[in-house]
């Protein structure tokens, strides 16, 4: 199994807008960090994306990632979900929407804020489906057991 941190910065990223580095040394290139998203890939090649940060487009491009099998959202804060629109291009060429997983309250809030992504409209296909999760129970996401 491979776990790739696509972003590991704070909710504002590092540096913050205004070139505020906080306690981070701007001379250290590793201190320039985008917001949190994680890609987990199992030995069968199934890819699970954890969270969709606002920096997701650049993270996918930088990582050469052109396919995911499922998405899991840890919670609905903006720094973990506002990259959801960048999943649209990953939906193209798929027979079905990308499966998405979240706790009940997070799923409810995602539907409220990004209803178009789960329902589709006009010329846009449905991007994502929201699948139920049972707390503390194993489930299959993509081709991975989590």
Per-segment meaning from a language model:
Residues 1-145:
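Binuclear metal-dependent hydrolase catalytic cores
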């Amino acid at each position: 199994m491979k776990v790739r941190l696509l972003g590991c910065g704070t909710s504002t990223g590092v540096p913050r807008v205004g070139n505020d580095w906080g306690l981070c040394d701007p001379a250290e290139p590793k201190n320039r960090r985008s917001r949190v998203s994680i890609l987990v890939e199992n030995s069968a090649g199934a890819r699970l994306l954890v969270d969709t940060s606002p920096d997701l487009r650049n993270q996918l491009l930088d990582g050469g990632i052109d396919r995911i099998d499922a998405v899991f959202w840890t919670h609905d804060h903006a720094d973990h979900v506002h990259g959801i629109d960048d999943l649209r291009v990953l939906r193209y060429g798929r027979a079905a929407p990308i499966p998405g997983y979240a706790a009940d309250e997070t799923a409810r809030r995602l539907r409220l804020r990004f209803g178009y992504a789960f329902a589709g409209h006009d010329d846009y296909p449905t991007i994502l489906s929201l699948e139920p999760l049972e707390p503390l129970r194993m489930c299959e996401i993509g081709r991975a057991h989590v």
